[in-house]
Structure formats: structure tokens, C-alpha cells
């Protein structure tokens, strides 16, 4: 299905991604973990064609992606939707209009300029928002929503493209644990119910283990781990993050229980 072969990206004399190879044969939820600067975001941007590879190739269902241009490239970006850490919504625009922006690649210039949306698309946008539990916010400005709600709007916008792949670049990095859980559960349901491939850059081990079928670890631009969640031991995590024996998974956790326990320990220590 999706094949990434020896993909490399250089910025001047700095190599951000080095000979990354990855095969996805069937729809799955794949998590990519690693410390900041490991090359996770650069890899996703190359898959989406937001950035060009220096070397290597990407193919999907036998079609070469790295050489696509113009209309064909835009069509691929509709098939391979992307959501970001900072949501990338239009703050003063209402929620449903932000979702409808997912159809821009297949609309005429005139329709885009005058915000002319077919009624069928409007109904579809509201149905998607309802599926994600935020239909009641459809007429509100995006800026009035919480971070978790805004990320679900961004997911809804991606679903308007009816993509085969969703790329999520640190989708929960700026969210509190409860909203992070809601967003990850939404992405997991989309994979399971729709049969879509979801590839998510994550910075927490517990999240990768809980929601992903497969986990890839990146360090210094290279893929250094590719396996099942249960194979992601603390020792393997140390190798991925380049950490020492004092490495603590709790420090990277988004689990509500773990964070509450950590806060309790800090409070207790303050009275010792």
C-alpha cells in the first residue's frame, strides 16, 4: 500500500531524515516516537508532499508519489490529509466553514472566493462534527473553542477530504491529558471504523502503546525501531530517546492517572 524507500531530506549540510524505509501493507494506526529534532515531522511532510525529498522514493498503491506535480500533487494531498499541533484553523471563521475548507482542492476558484458550498457538503460537514461530538459548536467561531475541540475540528476538516491516509503531526502535544485522550480515541475510531491508515507523530510512550498497532522510533533522522507496542520496552525507549538509566516514562506520560500520581508525589515531597 504505502512504501517509503531510503527517504532522505537534507537542509544544507544538516540531514533531517536519513535513508528512512517503511512499508505499510494494510490500513493500521502507526505511531512515530522520538525526541524533538528526530525527523518525525520532516518525514510526515515529505509523505504529504509539503516538502520534497532529497533522495529516495514514496509510492502508494503502486503509484510514485515523489514525482507528482500540479493537479496530481494536490489530488494526493487530498488522499493523504494532514493535521497539525497548532490546528491551523481560521480563528474568526465559524466551525462548519473551517471544516468545509477540507474541500478546497476540488472546488472552483469562484466557489472558493465567494464561499459557495453545496448543501450536500454542508450536511456532510455537520455529520462529521456530530460523529466527533462537537456538532453543537458548528455555528461558533473556531477561536471560541478549547484546544481539544479545535483539534477535533481539524480532524473533521481532514475527513471532509475523504482521505485514505491521515497524517497527524504531534496532534496532542499542546493539549491537557483529558483532551489528549479524546483526540487519540477519535483517531483510533476513525482507523477502526473507516479502515483508514493513521500515522501519528507522538512524544509519549504510553500513548503509542495504548492506541497504535505498530510503533516506529526515530533518532537523529534514522528509524531505529519498528515493531509492536508490546516490544517498546523501557530499554528500547532509552535507545530511541538517547537517555540514560535515569530515564523515566512518567516524565513523558499523558495518562491522567500517571500525572495525578506524579503531582501527589511532588506535593508529599514538599512537606518532607
Curated annotation (Swiss-Prot):
Alphabetized InterPro entries for the sequence: AAA+_ATPase, ABC_transporter-like_ATP-bd, ABC_transporter-like_CS, ABC_transpr_PhnC, MetN_ABC_transporter-like, P-loop_NTPase
Main localisation: membrane
Domain ABC transporter: start-end pairs: 2-245
Binding site for ATP: 34-41
Domain of life where this protein originates: Bacteria
Catalysed reaction, written as an equation: phosphonate(out) + ATP + H2O = phosphonate(in) + ADP + phosphate + H(+)
Pfam families for the chain: ABC_tran
Keywords attached to this entry: ATP-binding, Cell inner membrane, Cell membrane, Membrane, Nucleotide-binding, Phosphonate transport, Plasmid, Translocase, Transport
GO cellular component annotations of the record: plasma membrane
Subcellular location: Cell inner membrane
Entry-linked SMART domains: AAA
Molecular-function GO term, any one: ATP hydrolysis activity
Membrane topology: Peripheral membrane protein
Keyword hit for Cell membrane: yes
EC assignment: 7.3.2.2
Subunit-structure text: The complex is composed of two ATP-binding proteins (PhnC), two transmembrane proteins (PhnE) and a solute-binding protein (PhnD).
Summary of the function given for this chain in its UniProt record: Part of the ABC transporter complex PhnCDE involved in phosphonates import. Responsible for energy coupling to the transport system.
Family: Belongs to the ABC transporter superfamily. Phosphonates importer (TC 3.A.1.9.1) family.
Name listed for the protein in its UniProt record: Phosphonates import ATP-binding protein PhnC 2
Organism expressing this protein natively: Ruegeria sp. (strain TM1040)
